């Protein structure tokens, strides 16, 4: 049974919730624009500035509150029954941008609620966790769990996972974006 499930009807309205979720780190007061992609049993919600630059949602970016950082956020929901979907991934990446507009992935906030229980790092990966990508080994591949002690509650609904991600975004804003 999927961990975080929802209906297609609820999912089709989730884009505005995602936009509001990202307000703390977005340059745009109301949050970034969003779009969806469907196909092969997937429902993707991605965020961007203006019009999406390509059909690949992993290339979409939005401006953050820090002019030297851009962000990418998407949610991948997979169909498991007629009109029923579960959250497979929720991924945020922050990219440091230099004067030449070259991007370097800086930090990532991931959530993989469908990670199998028997996988080696599932208790760290299922809930929101950080990857410090600009650090030396082993940090870029470490799953720094933010809610391990509250995992059951965090994974109980789309709203509860959004709340946990929202708290992590506030931390990222205060501890990283405002500090650089």
Where are these regions (language model features)?
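Short, intrinsically disordered low-complexity segments
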Residues: 8, 13, 18, 69, ...
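Amphipathic, interaction-prone secondary-structure segments
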Residues: 38-100
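Glutamate identity and glutamate-enriched acidic tracts
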Residues: 10, 29, 59, 75, ...
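N-terminal "first-domain core" detector
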Residues: 1-60
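Hydrophobic, Leu/Ile/Phe/Ala-enriched alpha-helical segments that form helix-helix packing faces
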Residues: 15-29, 96-98, 168-179
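Long, compositionally biased interface segments
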Residues: 146-180
């Amino acid at each position: 049974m999927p961990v975080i499930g929802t209906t297609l009807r609820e999912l089709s309205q989730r884009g505005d919730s995602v936009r509001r979720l990202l307000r703390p780190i977005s340059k745009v007061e109301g949050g970034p624009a969003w779009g969806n992609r469907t196909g092969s049993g997937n429902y993707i919600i991605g965020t961007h500035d203006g019009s999406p630059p390509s059909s690949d949602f992993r290339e979409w970016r939005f401006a953050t509150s820090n002019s030297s950082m851009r962000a990418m956020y998407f949610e991948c929901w997979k169909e498991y029954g007629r009109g029923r979907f579960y959250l497979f991934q929720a991924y945020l990446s922050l990219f440091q941008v230099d004067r030449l507009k070259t991007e370097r992935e800086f930090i990532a906030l991931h959530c993989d609620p469908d990670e199998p229980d028997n996988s080696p790092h599932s208790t760290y990966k299922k809930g929101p966790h950080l990857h410090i990508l600009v650090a030396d080994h082993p940090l870029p591949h470490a799953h720094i769990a933010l809610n391990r002690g509250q995992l059951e509650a965090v994974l109980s609904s789309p709203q509860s996972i959004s709340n946990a991600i929202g708290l992590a975004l506030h931390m990222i804003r205060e501890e990283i974006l405002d500090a650089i």
